């Protein structure tokens, strides 16, 4: 019978004719007959012949201008590009990756996931082998740790290059110095990396061991036994106590709660902080004792494992009853792993374990984000490698290719290898850690958490900011503001009138019920005693408030009084309902706001379980209602409903509420709903339409029969259930329209203004309706009051999108507002053109956006503009957008921590993003740019000195400095001053916040570009040449004097260059300068005996008598001054003649 339920609603002939007429207008071809597609609220699109519509759009009925660049044949250009050029650049990578992936898939041979039959308490009856219920987050094991870490390091070309260079020192013919000269820096980098990986791996092992070793009670024929979480199998009956983690995916069989339901916390699974109500299988809940689970013959048929945590299809069957009992299972009957039991004790049968659980299947490794600064440094490093090879070839060429020239070439590669600094990555990683620490310690943005420490510089390069609305720009704290009944509207200042109407209605009902028990219902009697006008308004208010307080998924929770117990008690009908200790639990803040409002006007929800609700009237009377059916809210239906029976009158009523777009076709004809929805949305209110329908007992029984059959179907269950429910959703009586306000967060307006002045374009992506999104955009000053707004009209086909894009193209300097459906059509046919037009707008608002669309918009901006994007949100629907962006920011809000946990940076309020970007982002980028260039300068200058030295001595491949000189130069002699640049800042934080225009300069990338790189190369060549030639000219009698003079001048030059670059001194910078100088001076004395005199090494120039003379000091000073003074003069003149922006502000 269930399979006979129609899957799709029948389309009217008029609708089909209108659709054909529309298609005929937009193309010369006739309408294409085809199968109907299930879409109740979307206009159908004849996609087949739309694909045939030419881009030139020259058919009759279209306007085509010469300036219309939408008509460019871009497809042909892209097709030509995918030729030999594509294969040489990227095609071979794609082909190799595809082949490797194919081979890996063949080797792994993943087991196909299938549906399963699980017998209660009988794991041995499982037909197939299921994975162990163990959690493993470790990347390596004991045997693969060292090979794995080494592979991760040496898969990068530069690290592999340093390994080859270091290994070459084992070849006698290529050896040019001590082994530790090359192996010490490489070993240090590897040691730091392996230590960090080992610590992280050990922490993962400890966490996995702790989770896998948790003990649970397993129910067996002989009683309860303790079992580890990792030993749980499919079919086991597991008992989970309150506040205990659920170890695997289970079907909920029994609970200690009388209501047959329990609450669970899912914040670790979906990030939502609201408790979820779960319902036990009625057949097993009704068993007298726990041990009776083994006295019945029952099984669960479960669908194959899948990722969707919000849906489940299955059946429960008891075979030993007559007739057999069949119950449908849905998401409300499941207990997913990694959730927490919040009330009572639950018993469930395990259906999925290990990697087949929903939590594990939804755990994916997010993409490894690489910052733009790292990519730029990689490009510069590749340029340095080319310079290294070119310089070595030049030296060999000038040498005349004498002897074994290839050996000399390799030796020159070794001598000049310091051009590519191996310490660059270590310095930058340590700098990123410092930036993250500064962000988290900033008292002006408390609660900030840095979860991805590799991309702090991205915060200083952003061009596009994509933000959610609810909970991000707004507080997600809902306040009931407006009730509209069609003819009268009640606002915040007239709520006392509603309260008076409700109180009068129930007092008259009570008096009439006590005075006369025959005739009409109490409500009708109450109405008949009132004047005609008053009766109509009072009746409508009463029905509206009653519908609001009955149609929801809210559960009142009563906390026991202090000093008794900490257990949470749930209200029962016969207990004393206290307003003091009652709180409401629901999956949406809107629901709670509505129920709290009904409480404020006198009608209070005091109790709710699976089958009943109790309401308390203003006089204290308790009204009972039986819940017959509940239809929860889904993102597809955009509405929820409930069927209840009034126990005092036995009347059955179907209540429903939802979004206006979903409810408009359902309710009876009216002339005010659409207009008032628009009015409320323009005020920034979130609207819900409330309706009802009275049912007879026969109508309900017929519906229940069809609904039960649909729920038992294992194929297309959701479609069949929707079809049955839709048969009930016809000609419903419109009761009221509610408006709930979500207030803006603190300082949203100045923050958005600051971001706009910083050159950041802001796009708001929200799932809310167009009017509400537009109103919030105006009230938050996302769109200034002087700017025009172009509302992209609804389009459903390629032709309509073409015409609307042409109309939009003629607009200038106006904000764009577009719905998700229109956006989908535009991206399908005119992706490049739409993005190009949208990027020219000062602001863009996308409403009715799905999470997938949000992520796609981020990806499109990255692909089409090449600029850095940032996404910020607070809910689970923002996670995909946050992970797709170059920089993701999560806000810990009312909707939980899922967005915060998935983001790269976590903040507590939207206004904190201003300081995060203007101060920390800007400083991080400028500091890393200076640090990277200084580290490269440090390698370039010593390589220049080596080149000069070799050229002077007949291009001999002999090292100028050896041993500890090279190691000390890259570490203790210069590392601290150079690294102290991470504390430098050009302007004070207050100045950066006051003048956000300073941020705009960073998007051009001038702090680290090929121009600045070439300037530093020229500086290095100049200084290296001066230091080396100066030492050669001024040395006296021995060669060791050349080494002593040049190396000492080199160290002083590096220290002075750091001092000349610093713009704001920090006391740690001063300490670093003097510490490095002190280390160098002290090493002259302590290492004198360690190196032999007479060798070209560190000890060779330790002629104490020479280095303590005035001659040595003035020669070193002269060379240092000549190498640094001209640069200082040029810098001074530049700041006077063409000062940068920060200098103008500082002055």
From Swiss-Prot:
Cofactor entry: Mg(2+)
Pfam families reported for this sequence: Cation_ATPase, E1-E2_ATPase, Hydrolase, PhoLip_ATPase_C, PhoLip_ATPase_N
Signal peptide feature range: none
CDD domains linked: P-type_ATPase_APLT_Neo1-like
Binding site for ATP: 468-470, 591, 633, 638, 657, 686-687, 766-768, 848, 854, 877-878
Cytoplasmic domain ranges by topology: 1-146, 197-380, 432-930, 983-1012, 1062-1067, 1131-1147
Known EC number: 7.6.2.1
Annotated catalysed reactions: ATP + H2O + phospholipidSide 1 = ADP + phosphate + phospholipidSide 2
Segments crossing the lipid bilayer: 147-168, 174-196, 381-401, 410-431, 931-951, 964-982, 1013-1031, 1039-1061, 1068-1088, 1106-1130
Amino acid composition bias (Polar residues), ranges on this chain: 505-530
NCBIfam families in alphabetical order: ATPase-Plipid (TIGR01652), ATPase_P-type (TIGR01494)
Entry similarity comment: Belongs to the cation transport ATPase (P-type) (TC 3.A.3) family. Type IV subfamily.
Cross-referenced PANTHER family: PHOSPHOLIPID-TRANSPORTING ATPASE IIB-RELATED, PROBABLE PHOSPHOLIPID-TRANSPORTING ATPASE
Record-given protein name: Probable phospholipid-transporting ATPase IIB
Organism listed in the record: Homo sapiens (Human)
């Amino acid at each position: 019978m269930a399979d006979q339920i129609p899957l799709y609603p029948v389309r009217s002939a008029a609708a089909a004719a209108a659709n054909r007429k529309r298609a005929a207008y937009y193309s010369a071809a006739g309408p294409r007959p085809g199968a109907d597609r299930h879409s109740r609220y979307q206009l159908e699109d004849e996609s087949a012949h739309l694909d045939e519509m030419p881009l030139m759009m020259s058919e009759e009925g279209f306007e085509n201008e010469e300036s219309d660049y939408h008509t460019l044949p871009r497809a042909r250009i892209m097709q030509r590009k995918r030729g030999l050029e594509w294969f040489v650049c990227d095609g071979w990578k794609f082909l190799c990756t595809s082949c490797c992936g194919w081979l890996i898939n063949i080797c792994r041979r993943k087991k196909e996931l299938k549906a399963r039959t699980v017998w209660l308490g009988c794991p041995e009856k499982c037909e197939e082998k299921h994975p162990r219920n163990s959690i493993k987050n470790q990347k390596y094991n004991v045997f693969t740790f060292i090979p794995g870490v080494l592979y991760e390091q040496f898969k990068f070309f530069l690290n592999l290059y340093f390994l080859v260079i270091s290994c070459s020192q084992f070849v006698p013919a290529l050896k040019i110095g001590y082994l530790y000269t090359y192996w010490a820096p490489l070993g240090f980098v590897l040691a730091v990396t392996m230590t960090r990986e080992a610590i992280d791996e050990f922490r993962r092992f400890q966490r996995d061991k702790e989770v896998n070793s948790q003990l649970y009670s397993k129910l067996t024929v002989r009683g309860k036994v303790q079992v580890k979480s990792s030993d749980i199998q499919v079919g086991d009956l597991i008992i989970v106590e309150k506040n205990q983690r659920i170890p695997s995916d289970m079907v909920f069989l029994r609970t200690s709660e009388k209501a047959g339901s329990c609450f669970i916390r899912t914040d670790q699974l979906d990030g939502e902080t609201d408790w979820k109500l779960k319902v036990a299988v009625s057949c097993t809940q009704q068993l007298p004792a726990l041990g009776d689970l083994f006295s019945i013959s029952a099984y669960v048929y479960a669908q194959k494992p899948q990722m969707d945590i919000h849906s489940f299809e299955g059946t429960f069957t008891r075979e030993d009853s007559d007739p057999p009992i069949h119950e449908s299972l849905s998401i409300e009957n499941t207990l997913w792993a990694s959730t927490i039991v919040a009330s009572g004790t639950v018993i469930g049968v395990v259906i999925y374990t290990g990697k087949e659980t929903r939590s594990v299947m939804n755990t994916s490794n997010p993409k490894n984000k690489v910052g733009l600064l790292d990519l730029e440094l990689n490009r510069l490093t590749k340029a340095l490698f080319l310079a290294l090879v070119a310089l070595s070839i030049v030296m060999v060429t000038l040498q005349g290719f004498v002897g074994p020239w290839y050996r000399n070439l390799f030796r020159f590669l070794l001598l000049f290898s310091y051009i590519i600094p191996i310490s660059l990555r270590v310095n930058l990683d340590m700098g990123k850690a410092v930036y993250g620490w500064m962000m988290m310690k900033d008292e002006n943005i408390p609660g900030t958490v840095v979860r991805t420490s590799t991309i702090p510089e991205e915060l200083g390069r952003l061009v596009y900011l994509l933000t959610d609305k609810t909970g991000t720009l707004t507080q997600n704290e809902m306040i009931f503001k407006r009730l509209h009944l069609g003819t009268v509207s009640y606002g915040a200042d007239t709520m006392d009138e509603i309260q008076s109407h409700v109180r009068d209605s129930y007092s008259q009902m009570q008096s009439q019920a006590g005075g006369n028990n025959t005739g009409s219902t109490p409500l009708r009697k109450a109405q008949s005693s009132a004047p005609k006008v008053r009766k109509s308004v009072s009746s409508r208010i009463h029905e509206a408030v009653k519908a609001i307080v009955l149609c929801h998924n809210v559960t009142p929770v009563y906390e026991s009084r202090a000093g008794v117990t900490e257990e949470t008690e749930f209200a029962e009908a016969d207990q004393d309902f206290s307003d003091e200790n009652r709180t409401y639990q629901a999956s949406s803040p809107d629901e709670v706001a509505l129920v709290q409002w009904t409480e404020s006007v006198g009608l209070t929800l005091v109790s709710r379980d699976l089958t009943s609700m109790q309401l308390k009237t203003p006089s204290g009377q308790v009204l009972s209602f039986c819940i017959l059916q509940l239809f929860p809210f889904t993102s597809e239906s955009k509405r929820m409903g409930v069927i209840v029976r009034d126990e005092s009158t036995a009347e059955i009523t179907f209540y429903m509420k939802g979004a206006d777009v979903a409810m408009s076709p359902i309710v009876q004809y009216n002339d005010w709903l659409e207009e008032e929805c628009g009015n409320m949305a323009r005020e920034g209110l979130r609207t819900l339409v409330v309706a009802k329908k009275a049912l007879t007992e026969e109508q309900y029984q017929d519906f229940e029969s069809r609904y039960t059959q649909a729920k038992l179907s294992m194929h297309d269950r959701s479609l069949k259930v929707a079809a049955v429910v839709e048969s009930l959703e016809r000609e419903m009586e419109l009761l009221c329209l509610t408006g709930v306000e979500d207030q803006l967060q603190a300082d949203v307006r100045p923050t958005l203004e600051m971001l706009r002045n910083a050159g950041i374009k802001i796009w708001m992506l929200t799932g809310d309706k167009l009017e509400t999104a537009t109103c919030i955009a105006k009230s938050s000053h996302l769109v200034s009051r002087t700017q025009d707004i172009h509302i992209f009209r609804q389009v459903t086909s390629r032709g309509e999108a073409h015409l609307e894009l042409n109309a939009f193209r003629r607009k200038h300097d106006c904000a764009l507002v577009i719905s998700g459906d229109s956006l989908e059509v535009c991206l399908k046919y005119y992706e490049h053109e739409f993005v190009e037009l949208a990027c020219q707008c000062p602001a863009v608002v996308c409403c009715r956006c799905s999470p997938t669309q949000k992520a796609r918009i981020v990806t499109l901006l990255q692909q089409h503009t090449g600029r850095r994007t940032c996404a910020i949100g607070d809910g689970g629907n923002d996670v995909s957008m946050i992970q797709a962006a170059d920089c993701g920011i999560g806000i810990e809000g009312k909707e939980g921590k899922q967005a915060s946990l998935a983001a790269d940076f976590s903040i507590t309020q939207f206004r904190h993003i201003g300081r995060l970007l203007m101060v920390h982002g800007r400083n991080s980028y400028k500091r890393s740019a200076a640090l990277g260039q200084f580290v490269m300068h440090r390698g370039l200058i010593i390589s220049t000195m080596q080149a000069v030295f070799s050229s002077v001595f007949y291009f001999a491949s002999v090292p100028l400095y050896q041993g500890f000189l090279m190691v000390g130069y890259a570490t203790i002699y210069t590392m601290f001053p150079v690294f102290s640049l991470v504390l430098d800042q050009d302007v004070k934080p207050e100045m950066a916040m006051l003048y956000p225009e300073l941020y705009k300069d960073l998007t051009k990338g001038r702090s680290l570009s090929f121009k600045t790189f070439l300037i530093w190369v020229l500086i290095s060549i100049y200084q290296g040449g001066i230091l080396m030639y100066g030492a050669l000219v001024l040395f006296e009698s021995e060669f060791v004097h050349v080494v002593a003079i040049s190396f000492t001048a080199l160290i002083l030059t590096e220290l002075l260059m750091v001092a000349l670059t610093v713009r704001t001194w920090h006391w740690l910078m001063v300490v670093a300068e003097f510490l490095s100088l002190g280390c160098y001076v002290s090493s002259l004395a302590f290492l004198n005996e360690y190196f032999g005199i007479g060798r070209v090494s560190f000890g060779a120039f330790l002629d104490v008598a020479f280095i303590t003379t005035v001659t040595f000091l003035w020669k070193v000073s002269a060379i240092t001054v000549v190498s640094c003074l001209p640069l200082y003069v040029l810098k001074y003149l530049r700041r006077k003649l063409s000062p940068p922006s920060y200098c103008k502000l500082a002055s």
